[in-house]
């Protein structure tokens, strides 16, 4: 028995030693963090003030663009350092070291797509000095915050660099046009997709949240008061790496913008400057091609191209994966590259992927040039860079110009092959090398109707029918989408049906709560209404409720809960390509859920649909694919907690004299992570009430509304007026 005890003790000691060895060896293999004193000293080169308005929104004011970028990095870190840190770790391929195995696929994709080979090779050659100075200043702001708050910093993060910002664009932008869906097709049915849902935006999951948005521009000719108006209304997750943060930047070098920012980026991604503005929505062109490779049966390290065997380019991806606590294991996986692009080996063979934007580090440059454009010509010059590989753009400016672009880095492809299918991988003439010029992209400028819109729908419905683009004018090789959304139909039925849009109507139409009779939802709803209820009392009652439903989603509506809980799962399954359940089964599930949790099958929609933040719980109207977009996550009590949809909303107006005003609202507030802050949820009541607040764009507008005025690292000084530069 004594020998058994000694043996067991020895085994424990060996295991403990192995764990200690893994922990120590992993830490030794990582570079030493920089001296915090050096990061703090770097801050001395910047002259900037952060002025928080009464909603906590930061206004960053400095003499140079670099000063403002530094202040933005610091201010955003004050409110959401955890997410900025997560973004940096993800784009470096280091997320699994903190998040565990669920993030290993993301880390592998960073290697597979050669994110850092691209950034390191092209950062200095392809990005001008003025931009690099801004990128590095933003990174200095993040580092300064981290140095002052070392307890919040994950080991290995520092220093954050300008290259991290660039890598974020290089890695993330292809997922906005559906690269993840193409990867999913190549994996097993049990595989996942890169999710855009909240804090898990970089993790593999098979239940991504819907991506949707609205953008509308109205010209003076269609406005009752001769104004030019722009709606900025992206539907995003409420939290996480692709959630919106509001700020105003004001540089003495002309970088003066207000709008929405993502964690880890110094640039306004959509919003306005003094002269012009734009809104983005996600589009769905075919920008990814998949090639089935012929692998040498005698040598798995080769593939055939034009009758010759070529060697795969091979490298090793070392992925550090958190196992438990501080224990990190280094996993290794082979990375293959062919002439077409990255290679994935699956049970069905080896496939190469070629996608728009690969190898391009210039998205940051395009965003910076868009931010500083002073007129339509400069803005279009920035768009001609074609470095942002997708997204719809709806534009408006102080001169009354409006426009719509179905933006994309469209490959120049041969006519004939089925580019939306799997292509033969042994023909080099199917490997495209260039993009369709910007001026050949689908776009509409200053149409006779005086309005343009997009709600993730086809570009062939973007204005009044007489001014719409024609499908026959574009090559099928562009892969332009032809689908419509409910929001697209409702835009046509509201903005498109009103020849003289007032300021009030422009606002009211944005908060439209109805499903169009032409929508997919209405078609599925018709299937549900056709269910034979027979003698089933529940089905008969449900049929009566649904028959009287007006297809609206007001908080007091007593048909919306039953209808949406029935039709939304059916639509989701069909969109996902899954075998949908029978409508009667979906209806029975909705009935059971509502009876169990609410004691009736016709509760008010606001009892079910909730906006929650900390201890706050508010009824909210709207729903899936509604212009007032709200996507909820089912809770154990049967309610839905809004997780995505309407978030940061902005209304921009230039009156007929060109004077700018704008209003905005955020679903929560500027304090992303601090529940003790008064700005953690102070905008939520306004948000659910469809109200907005003024954007204090100029120093004169901001004066008298300043809650805090400080240099980075010196917060606490209260001011009542604007600070000088």
What are these model-derived regions, one by one?
Residues 2-527, 532-535, 541-725:
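C-terminal/peripheral segments of proteins
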